[in-house]
Amino acid sequence: MAQDETISPAEDAAVLEALFDHSPTGLLILDPELRILRINLTRPALHNVDLAQIVGRHITDVYDLSAPGEVQEMLDGVLESGAPAQGHLVRVRPKGAPGPEYLFSVSVSRLESPRGRVWGLLAEMLDVTEREKVSARVHVYGAVRQYVGQTLNVVTTCEELVRELVPGVADIAVVEVVDAVVRGENPPPSPLQREVPLRRAAVCRSGGEEQIQAHPVGDVRALPFTTPYAQTLADLEPRLVALGPDTPWLAADPRRAEAIRAAGAHSLITVPLTLRGTVLGLLSLYRTRHTDGFETGDVTLAVAAAAHTALCIDNARRFTREHTIALTIQRHALPLRPATPTTVETAHMHVPSETGEAAGSTPSPCPAPGPR
């Protein structure tokens, strides 16, 4: 094109058409009343609709937004001030659709005529759904590594795990530990035998609302073999399971089935707590009616969190066993009570300091028999 040539209106329109239709980011044009004039979104689930049915409608009539009030305030602010908004995270789902939510980074600019008349808004929508999921999983795993295993107590370690997984990964998290492990005994080898009992060590739910519990914390029982819980401990493989009202294996555990249905749980992950071919316990994660189902990335995170926790549980188990042995030896090493009555008797016992500081043996005076 020669330097003195100009683009015709038709060519100018064609260039804009190509830019709009082939933009790598989603584009949305709204009028001053926030009604949709044109749309080009990269997610098929968001634009696979009849354009004739959405053009001219308010954006909140077409899409469910995670925070519609905040979005409305942002758009109104750009219309009034002309100052663009950059990088607002907005969760979007087609109106009334049961599918997953998508997360967009939204930047908005005001459209004006050469004379300054406001035409509307241009919204650029970058799909960051997968990026944010990965970032969230990395954050949760970092928290598990930092906060799980701070004590040498099996049950406390399990409680630390479920607190870090809810609500960032799951709506409900349950940890069950082989009962012998809680007492400091050696964990059984895999595959776990059907009759081996597990103790429900920790449960955490999002929202804190009261829900039906399959079994209370502290309950000890074996797992029905036909369930994915028992199968996970048999082959030490994680499972991602869809849950529904007619899921056949729920009949093998009626109380657990009742709790699952009451919570509206529709997605389940089961992961073994295992170390060096032995079985320490089981991690179960649930998502309920308020959230999307689990993905393979969530399974990967759960496996990594379970591996770290299994090591911490085994350390706590070893400490429990050694502490029990030390107390037993200490009791047997106490001096026998002297047969001769005395005015004051002393009993010697070494009491370890809870603060980790050195503590000596302190004689404890006891009253002597008789009138003295």
Feature map (PLM): residue ranges:
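GAF sensory/regulatory domain recognition
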Residues: 44, 52, 163, 176-221
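Short hydrophobic secondary-structure edge segments in sensory/regulatory modules of signaling proteins
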Residues: 27, 173-175, 268
